[in-house]
A protein has these predicted regions:
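Generic recognition of cysteine residues
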Residues: 9, 23, 38, 58, ...
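Short, low-complexity, polar/charged sequence segments that are solvent-exposed and flexible
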Residues: 25-29, 55-58, 120-122
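An acidic/histidine-cluster motif and surrounding catalytic segment
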Residues: 31, 38, 46-63, 94
Length: 125
């Protein structure tokens, strides 16, 4: 079972922009009994992984978070959500699964695609 933990990354140390504040508020509103862990350079040892260290040194926050999100899910389990994702409905129904990922559909007159996304991922520890 997936634990009630929401993970997200904020590595720049900057104040959250208004969009990110609204997104985090949406998580708290839709999943009030979930623990929220914000991964930063203070609580993740960026020197523990060469890729993360180099990404942070170049201020490539999204690259570093690609590793950290998987680290968090592997070691703690829970749900990783990108900081710019607004949630309208609880993910509680997904907790009975061992893992899940998000998908993005693109439907237009000349193409139809379905991409697996890493913006929202969930897994057991």
């Amino acid at each position: 079972m997936i634990p009630k933990i929401i993970h997200f990354c904020w590595l720049s140390g900057d104040k959250y922009p208004e969009l990110v504040q609204k997104c985090i508020s949406s998580w708290k509103k839709t999943m009030p009994d979930f623990q929220i862990i914000c991964w930063t350079t203070e609580n993740f040892d960026i020197n523990s992984n060469t890729f993360v260290r180099e990404a942070v040194a170049c201020k490539k926050w999204a690259f570093a978070s690609d590793y950290i999100r998987l680290y968090a899910l592997y070691h703690y389990g829970g749900i990783y959500i990108d900081s710019d994702v607004f949630v309208f409905k609880s993910f509680e129904p997904f907790l009975a699964n061992r893992a899940f990922s998000s998908v993005e559909y693109c439907i237009s007159s000349n193409c139809y695609t379905c991409n697996i996304e890493a913006a929202i991922l969930g897994s057991e520890k």
